[in-house]
Amino acid sequence: MDKMKIEAIDILDRIIIGRVDPHIYAFTTNTVPNYLKVGDTYRPVSQRLNEWRVFFPELEKQYENKAIIDEETYFRDYAIHQYLENDLNKKRLKPEDLEDGIYYSREFFKEAETGDIDNAIEDIKESYQANSSKYEYYSSKNRLPQTFHYQRGEQWTLRPNQKSAVDSFIRAVENGRRNLLMYAVMRFGKSFTSLCCALEISANIVLVVSAKADVKDEWKKTVEGAGNFSEYVFLEAYDLALSENAIKANRKENKKVVIFLTLQDLQGNAIKDKHKELFKEQIDLLIIDETHFGARAESFGKILENAGYEKSDKSNINKLDDENIDVNVAEEELKQINARIRLHLSGTPYRILMGSEFEKEDIISFVQFSDIVKEQEEWDKNNLNKDDINEWDNPYYGFPQMVRFAFNPNKSSCEKMEALKRSGVTFAFSKLFEPESIKKDTVNNGHKKFKNETEILELLQVIDGSKEDENLLGFLDYDKIKEGKMCRHMVMVLPYCASCDAMEELLSKLKDTFKNLGEYEIINISGVDAGRIYKKPNDIKNKIKECEDSNKKTITLTVNRMLTGSTVEQWDTMLYFKDTSSPQEYDQSIFRLQNQYIRTLSSANGFIKENLKPQTLLVDFDPDRLFRMQEQKSLIYNVNTEENGNSKLKERIVEELRISPVIMMNHNKIKEVDLLRSEERRVGKECRSRWSPYH
């Protein structure tokens, strides 16, 4: 990618940060003369210094250096402090040294200089090589077991917005409400929060129903790991099949139960026989993981009909066990369950909220991702000035910022789509990625070849940086993305199962011709035969983890699989290559990127938590769709809160764009979208006449 040809690239340089190595920083301030403040940070130093400027407006940065021995071993600012005090006899600032009203931190050192920090780091590194125990080192190789936080006995603490949801649940139940909705964005912690609701009503039998089998482990981990739920036993379909009296047997021993079933478990008479005991019992709390149920209900109904997909592709999708649900049958089974209280969980309840099923008194939580980010920022503002607080003590630490690229496709693809539209094709974007055969073609391998291979190859080449296009950034060749270790594990969302096969074939066949795409291992999880290779979601997760452990980048090819309810912590980039008009399907997909991905490095006396995914990238090749989805979500929020009116809607959109910026490229010029500025409104209109820049 030739940065010299791109106007206003500095906008992108400012926004893209990526993974940040830990740094030692130092500053001086005229309010504490002759003292040097020495600290460390796991975010950009400039960001940390701006937070300190609240207390020291005139501070001047004096020093910045990495707090790293090697990629697996870090040190803290405590090691620098130790050297300054013990080796150089530098005195720490004391409260009595300050005039009244000046903020106190004990990390100021009298007459310390930047050269002293250099000497300290040199001594720290030499001591490490000599295997000395002088300093404390933090290593990922000796890190605390990842299951540490899930050992029974550890009490998990509700975050403020989770506690608010539980309090609202209690009030609603006390007021006689029996059909409740917890609307909270993916990654909120709905399983933990809803089980805390079960505790509050002393529920003996809790039934959790989900459309996705792979979320079972999340529920199991929560029930069996958190000390909060020590009275509960986790049961699943297998346990009920082993013993028809599994529930009664546990209740006789005064144990409470949380039963997890999938919608597939509820389908079919033979399976239902295994659950006779369950259907006889009074369920104290029925938790319906509506996040996934609602998304599937829509995606296999209207989406397949209205987004231009071939109906024959539904059979390919249904071959994948974790995708095959008869929603109507499952819904009927849910109605038969005798539940005292029903709690629906959803991160994308847009259709539900625009209906009449839930009144405002039934909605116990209304949390979007921007709300989590604001809580994260507020916590930092109120706590990071304290000497004993670490950045990772923030309960929201590690929630990534999503940077959104709203790009038009390459020129030849745009022209092809224009031709398709003129011929009467409504969903030209999905049609662009149509393979020669939707079904498996054993004669000509048509399911492994795109009808428009030339155009798609050129699109990939521009993304890769091996070709240029004035309206599309070759972001894989952008230096800040490479330096920030972004785009390591990408997801391509494609319209047909066979599109995944065709993409795999194209990327593999021309691997050596790409500058960057050739470095990726292709993981095809939705192809015509994908179910044979990756039978279970954990097979997919394990494959990606193995690649990351081997320092290999990956591209996962999917249609719908793993895009609702699944967590692949390494995923950091999504390329959206299909049509959809469903805010639910769209958000379910893109928020797969927004999980925390944290590495723990430990020493004998403590640990460091490193954020491996500070930013994610959504690349949407339909700018109009991205803007439309943004507006619809903000409008739905407005309608369902007290914040009505156009001014409030504008404020919400402005805040969303601050938290998750949108970047466009037009005629080799980068723009950050501000929908309230006339220039961006003009560009937005230009994007709405999709692919028009070439005409």
State each model region's role.
Residues 41-43, 212, 261-265, 290, ...:
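A short beta-strand-to-loop transition that corresponds to the Sensor-1 phosphate-sensing loop
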Residues 112-149, 435-462, 622-695:
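Long, largely alpha-helical accessory region at the distal end of helicase-like NTP-driven motors
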Residues 132-339, 475-484, 501-548:
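SF2 helicase/translocase NTPase motor core
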